[in-house]
Amino acid sequence: PKTKLYRIGPGSANRIQFRVLDSVNALRQAAGVSTLQMDAKLNAAAATHSRDMAVQNRPWHFGSDGSSPIDRVQRAGYSGRMVGETISETYETELQTLSAWMEEPSTRAVILDPTARDLGFSWHQESNGKIWWTMVLGSPDLAAIPGMAAAPLDSAVNAG
């Protein structure tokens, strides 16, 4: 039987982003770590990288301009610490992609990182149906919380 191509329709962004947030939070709760909240600036960083990976036609963590995940998060205006980034080039749905990430120890560690508090998730879909997914996790600036110290931005964990 012919498989149906997964197409993301216009106006689906919020539904997809919150479906992923709910799924990630269920996985995090099951692992005994705190839940995340959606962050618009991390969403913007993820969207920028998804489009850029499509232009480069390769799934990797560096932008065509040499930018790192940390650079993109800072450019998007996120003032916290970047915890990690997961990426994928696939024809699979967001939940199939999340499941695949959870099967890999390096990406699972990013998704379940206990220091993360914020989530950004976005994608770029090509006309042939290929989807470039990017998830970015961050932690707010802990220096603003009494009794907490901020971790340096360069301590990010990047996983593929």
Feature locations, PLM:
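Disulfide-stabilized extracellular recognition modules
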Residues: 1-3, 7, 14, 88-160
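Loop/turn elements at helix/coil->beta-strand transitions in domains of secreted/extracellular proteins
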Residues: 29-34, 78, 82-83, 116-119, ...
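A short alpha-helix/helix-coil micro-patch that ends at or immediately precedes a cysteine
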Residues: 1-56
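Short, surface-exposed glycine/acidic/tryptophan-bearing loops
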Residues: 43-93, 111
